[in-house]
Curated annotation (Swiss-Prot):
GO terms for cellular component: cytosol. Keywords: Glycolysis, Isomerase, Manganese, Metal-binding. The lineage of its organism: Bacteria, Pseudomonadati, Pseudomonadota, Gammaproteobacteria, Enterobacterales. Its cofactor is Mn(2+). Belongs to the BPG-independent phosphoglycerate mutase family. Binds 2 manganese ions per subunit. The active site is at 64 (phosphoserine intermediate). Gene3D superfamilies: Alkaline Phosphatase, subunit A, BPG-independent phosphoglycerate mutase, domain B. GO terms for biological process: glucose catabolic process; glycolytic process. NCBIfam families: pgm_bpd_ind, PRK05434.1-5. Substrate binds at residues 125, 155-156, 187, 193, 263-266, 337. This is 2,3-bisphosphoglycerate-independent phosphoglycerate mutase.
């Protein structure tokens, strides 16, 4: 293998959006001499990373999964959110064979239909409209015992915003005359993705045993009590909802459980705890023999459970195209974004392509990343620099999670520190790429840290934004072609590498080498 390759390096600064106003802008107010200089001196532009430009509904903020799928595919990929909205609107959702079979089986056996998911209008991991449609589907097909286990958001939505959703669903159940909200828990516990199994166990025990820190008879009241304890939506402790004289709504053998999240990365752990016979993340006090356990979308190829909406396969993504041309590639990130530069960037393909190496750096084990805004950036940079210098790779894809993960905490000073950490890392990466006569693209998958307070509510802004993101090129003399979006990045890299662009990629190169 050649040992003097000049790599095409893509650095994705997660959650690093562009916003002109300084107020509450951790990116603009941070000391970033390196990025400032690159923006002034190198070919650059702003590119779209949200809404219709990435296959989401118009105006919908971008997110990491969607961003990386578009980055790697080189075409606009219509997302699960858009697809499900369309299915519900046109009525096809209510005839989905996997969903209807699970409900019918439970109804015929006199069993309950349990629905779990992130109860949120955020549209990143789920949408509450889909959960409502599922409740309606179950009711239409004769289910009497319909139980909603609500995971609360406060991360892709304002930190204390769940009341409207809980009231909406309390009213919906009352109107249907069947079913109820059975439990509440913050997504911090139910949707962990970093192998913190003690968190997931709390959600598992809540659903399987109706075991919670609190028991009350009213969802909105339970939320208010959580706020009084100092818990925002994301961190609401396990709460059982049970009125006087009502039976507990825990899972029983033969029940159906339908998981209404459509995004995979934060769904996998809790699903494995329910369905994997050899699960060993924590001791399960009670193992459920489900009538059916249904995933809304495919969370991982190795999870053996029915899937209502299997993925549409993407051919000739950036990674696959490199493999077909005998090129070598590296994917590298921390735990928090490792799935994004591998599984999502490869269009939902779990296994590495031939010639694709992967490096995983452990994210620090802290409760929230404002406590360590540097995260593992120093170690990640060291490994990246070594890979660039090695001469082994034609292309390197790297994600720095700091802007997004610290942005999600809503802690402004920590976000500033995260951005300043990134600037120092970028300085080293630029020098390393220049030293081997390589090429470098710096961009982001969506915004976050540029808006740390919500001007409308005055609360911390913990969600993503729908703002554009920067794109900077360092390498050969070149000029920018404006009007770009994330799906233009893969064709841009291929063009800069002197490679043909596959016909499946409808994106356009954004830099013309002079």
């Amino acid at each position: 293998m050649s040992s003097n390759k000049k790599p095409m390096v893509l650095v994705i600064l997660d959650g690093y959006g562009h916003r002109e106003e300084q107020q509450d802008n951790a990116i603009l107010n941070a000391k970033t001499p390196v990025m400032d200089r690159l923006w002034q001196q190198q070919p650059h532009q702003l590119i779209a990373a949200s809404g219709l430009d990435v296959g989401l509904p118009d105006g919908q903020m971008g997110n990491s999964e969607v961003g990386h799928v578009n980055l790697g595919a080189g075409r606009i990929v219509y997302q699960d959110l858009t697809r499900l909205d369309k299915e519900i609107k046109e009525g096809d959702f209510f005839a989905n064979p996997t969903l209807t079979a699970a409900v019918d089986k439970a109804v015929q056996a006199g069993k309950a239909v349990h629905i779990m998911g992130l109860l949120s209008p955020g549209g990143v991991h789920s949408h509450e409209d889909h959960i409502l449609a599922m409740i309606e589907l179950a009711s239409q097909r004769g289910a009497k015992a319909v139980y909603l286990h609500a995971f609360l958001d406060g991360r892709d939505t304002p930190p204390r915003s769940a009341e409207a959703s809980l009231q909406r669903f309390s009213d919906a159940f009352a109107k249907l005359g069947t079913g109820r909200i059975a439990s509440l828990i913050g997504r911090y516990y139910a949707m962990d993705r970093d192998n913190r199994w003690d968190r997931v166990q709390l959600a598992y025990d809540l659903l399987t045993q109706a075991k919670g820190d609190y028991v009350t008879d009213n969802a909105v009241g339970a939320l208010q009590a959580a706020y009084e304890r100092g818990e925002n939506d994301e961190f609401v402790k396990p709460t059982v909802l049970q009125a006087a004289g009502e039976a507990k709504a825990e899972l029983h053998d033969g029940d159906a459980l339908i998981f209404m999240n459509f995004r995979a990365d934060r769904a996998r752990q809790i699903v494995r705890s329910f369905v994997n016979a050899d699960f060993d993340g924590f001791p399960r006090a009670k193992i459920i023999n489900f009538g059916d356990f249904v995933m809304l979308t495919e969370y991982a190829a190795d999870i053996k459970a029915p899937c209502a909406y299997p993925p549409a396969s993407l051919s000739n993504t950036f990674g696959e195209w490199l493999m077909k041309h005998d090129k070598t590639q590296l994917r590298i990130s921390e735990t928090e974004k490792y799935a994004h530069v591998t599984f999502f960037f490869n269009g939902g393909v779990e296994e590495p392509f031939t010639g694709e190496d992967r490096v995983l750096i452990n994210s620090p084990k802290v409760a929230t990343y404002d406590l360590q805004p540097e995260m593992s950036a120093a170690e990640l940079t060291d490994k990246l620099l070594a890979a660039i210098a090695s001469g082994k790779y034609d292309a390197i894809i790297c994600n720095y999670p700091n802007g997004d993960m610290v942005g999600h905490t809503g802690v402004y000073d920590a976000a500033v520190k995260a951005v300043e950490t990134l600037d120092n890392c970028i300085a080293q990466v630029v020098e390393a790429v220049k030293a081997v006569d390589g090429q470098l693209l710096i961009t982001a998958d969506h915004g976050n840290a540029e808006q740390m307070r919500d001007p409308a509510t005055g609360q911390a802004h913990t969600a993503h934004t729908s703002l554009p993101v920067p794109l900077i090129y360092i390498g050969k003399p070149a000029s920018a072609v404006n009007g770009g979006k994330l799906s233009d990045i893969a064709p841009t890299m291929l063009a800069l590498m002197g490679m043909e662009i596959p016909q499946e990629m409808t994106g356009k190169p954004l830099f013309i080498v002079e």
